[in-house]
């Protein structure tokens, strides 16, 4: 399954890690630089996309059109 996660806070990061452990394909979008550094230590870099999850260009680059599931973990 291909899961697209908007938001890389605690919930988004934990969800991404669990899904990756279960061999799912994951893309995570986060715009806060302070979280991006932490995320790169928790999940593979190729999963993480820097940007705002409402930006059409970021969504296209991250492959939203191929996703089976979209999870919003935002404030």
Please provide the spans of the model-predicted regions.
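Cytosolic regulatory regions of ion transport systems
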Residues: 1-75
């Amino acid at each position: 399954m291909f899961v697209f996660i908007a938001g890389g806070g605690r919930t988004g990061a934990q969800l991404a890690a669990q899904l990756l452990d279960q061999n799912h394909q994951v893309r995570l979008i986060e715009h806060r630089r302070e979280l991006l550094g932490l995320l790169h230590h928790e999940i593979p870099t190729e999963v993480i996309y820097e940007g705002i999850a409402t930006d059409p260009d970021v969504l296209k680059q991250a492959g939203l059109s191929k996703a089976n599931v979209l999870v919003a973990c935002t404030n």
